[in-house]
């Protein structure tokens, strides 16, 4: 009898502990993003996993913690293409984002030098298309102001640098190099370097000064995670990290100092030994390859010349090498993510990857797919290749892209609806820090065809449906990295990763969505961000 009583007490104790671990979340609506687009009023969690969903009354007791949200619960938003660590690790650099002229840049550099006594000056984030005069400057003013110190000013896309003579001297370019890099080293009419370098030379200069760079900035990475949470991001795909970034992030995840789910691709040439941490929130997915450059730097590889130039851009990896990388990924069952912006690069990527991905579920991705020839859209479906796109790029670029590509670009550039119609699904991201991490801006841009900060409602790009846009930031983003069984929708058995907003993205009007507030972000059942009242 005594033994039975003890067993009874143990069962009661276990039941009480189980009840204490239960968390009930209630909201105005829960949008699940499941196959039927089901909605609910409450969700029950246990140990960070979704256990039950419902609309009617839930019989609870004081052992079940209940939180009521005045808002709408969504699956945790996933940024399907961003550079999580890039901006955080660049905090020591002179911030040139949103500058409106080269004069403003010079003023910032002068102020920066007073407070930063480094052996060089490194600035980051300028975009000449934000200036009143978008003409690229040369190094003369930098040479005059900083004759004895290397000055490196990287464009917002990371594919172009303006530097002074002292920085160019670090490259030690020979006459042979000048021929090798003729498309990447800008020369004036007299054959003198202007200070503008691109692509491989950018990487080469970065490597030369990397030994002088701060190796650790843990606090900045942790702060960056909170910035993502504040914007409603509950997971991310980090596209193209190097060994240094990997080591920093892996250590922070191991210590539990970073929690945001991170599904990462490494730059080609680096494969980590330890590809998944115990917390299952820092997971290697595959290799990222840069096939071409960018439109802003005029290095995206096109089928036709850029307007008023004799250049079609730059192919950074030849077809044979891309084929070799494809074989490597295929044999190792890794995903392959190819940066392809120009229509020529996209055609090469589609046809090369397609040899291995056709009729197979490899989930290989083309990142950006900004310019695609009309005859090539169908290949995304034919070869089962995922378009991974960033709608806010189209908003940022629309003022100058026609002048760069011609009127034909209106049919081939930033054609997200055509991509979706072909591929049947797509992953949406921001390319942060090139664009802001704001997922509401992503949704707004691709649904309403305009920028969230624009005052008019003129359609800039063809829109897609609200449901498809939401899926692109949730279940399709998860599917793009083989995580759809764990995250991306609110279903029983999945992780409790939620984004809670003040608005209903599927029904509220355009102006109301523009003013959406992130109420809370939840990862693994724990509130990692809550809007202060």
List the model feature ranges, each with a label.
Residues 1-21:
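Bacterial Sec-dependent N-terminal signal peptides
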Residues 20-27, 31, 35-270, 289, ...:
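Divalent metal-binding segments
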Residues 51-52, 519-520, 529:
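A structural microfeature
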Residues 241-243, 268-270, 369-372, 504-506:
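Short beta->alpha connector loops
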Residues 270-272, 284:
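Hydrophobic, small-residue-rich alpha-helical packing segments that form membrane-like cores
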Residues 283-299, 385-395:
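Non-cysteine beta-strand/loop elements that form the S-adenosyl-L-methionine
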Residues 327-337, 344-364, 368-369, 375-378, ...:
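His/Asp/Glu-enriched, well-ordered alpha-helical/loop segment
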């Amino acid at each position: 009898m005594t033994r039975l009583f003890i067993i009874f007490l143990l069962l009661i104790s276990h039941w009480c502990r189980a009840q204490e671990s239960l968390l009930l979340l209630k909201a105005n609506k829960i949008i699940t993003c499941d196959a039927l687009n089901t909605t609910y009023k409450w969700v029950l969690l246990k140990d960070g996993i979704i256990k039950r969903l419902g609309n009617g009354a839930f019989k609870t007791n004081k052992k079940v913690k209940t939180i009521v949200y005045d808002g709408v619960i969504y699956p945790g938003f996933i940024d399907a293409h961003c550079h999580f660590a890039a901006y955080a690790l660049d905090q020591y650099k002179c911030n040139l984002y949103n500058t409106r002229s080269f004069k403003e840049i010079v003023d910032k550099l002068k102020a920066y030098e007073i407070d930063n006594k480094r052996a060089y000056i490194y600035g980051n984030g300028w975009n000449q298309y934000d200036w009143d005069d978008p003409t690229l400057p040369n190094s003369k003013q930098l040479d005059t102001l900083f004759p004895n110190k290397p000055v490196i000013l990287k464009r917002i896309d990371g594919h172009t640098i303006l530097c002074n003579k002292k920085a160019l001297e670090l490259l030690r370019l020979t006459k042979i190099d000048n021929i090798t890099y003729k498309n990447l080293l800008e020369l004036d009419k007299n054959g003198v370097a202007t200070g503008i370098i691109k692509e491989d030379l950018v990487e080469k200069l970065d490597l030369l000064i990397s030994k002088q760079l701060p190796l650790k900035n843990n606090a900045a990475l942790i702060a960056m995670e909170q910035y993502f949470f504040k914007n409603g991001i509950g997971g991310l795909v980090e596209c193209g990290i190097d060994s240094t970034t990997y080591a920093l992030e892996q250590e922070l995840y191991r210590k539990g100092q970073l929690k945001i789910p991170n599904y990462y691709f490494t730059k080609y040439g680096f494969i980590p030994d330890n590809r998944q941490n115990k917390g299952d929130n820092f997971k290697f997915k595959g290799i990222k390859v840069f096939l071409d450059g960018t439109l802003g730097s005029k290095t995206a590889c096109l089928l036709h010349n850029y307007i008023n130039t004799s250049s079609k851009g730059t192919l950074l990896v030849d077809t044979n090498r891309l084929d070799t990388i494809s074989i490597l990924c295929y044999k190792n069952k890794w995903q392959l993510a190819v940066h392809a912006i120009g229509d020529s690069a996209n055609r090469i990527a589609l046809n090369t990857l397609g040899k291995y991905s056709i009729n197979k579920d490899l989930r290989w991705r083309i990142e950006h797919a900004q310019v695609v020839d009309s005859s090539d859209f169908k290949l995304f479906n034919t070869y089962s290749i995922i378009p991974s796109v960033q709608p806010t790029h189209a908003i940022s670029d629309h003022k100058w892209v026609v002048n760069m590509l011609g009127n034909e670009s209106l049919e081939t550039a930033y054609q997200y609806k055509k991509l979706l119609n072909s591929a049947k699904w797509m992953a949406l991201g921001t390319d942060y820090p090139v664009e802001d991490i704001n997922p509401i801006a992503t949704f707004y841009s691709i649904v309403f065809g305009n920028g969230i900060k624009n005052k008019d409602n003129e359609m800039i790009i063809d829109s897609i449906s609200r449901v498809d846009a939401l899926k692109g930031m949730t279940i399709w983003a998860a599917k793009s990295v083989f995580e759809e069984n764990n995250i991306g929708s609110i279903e029983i058995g999945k992780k409790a990763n939620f984004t809670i907003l003040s608005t209903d993205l599927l029904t509220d009007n355009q102006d109301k969505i523009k003013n959406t507030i992130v109420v809370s972000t939840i990862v693994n059942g724990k509130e990692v961000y809550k809007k202060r009242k």
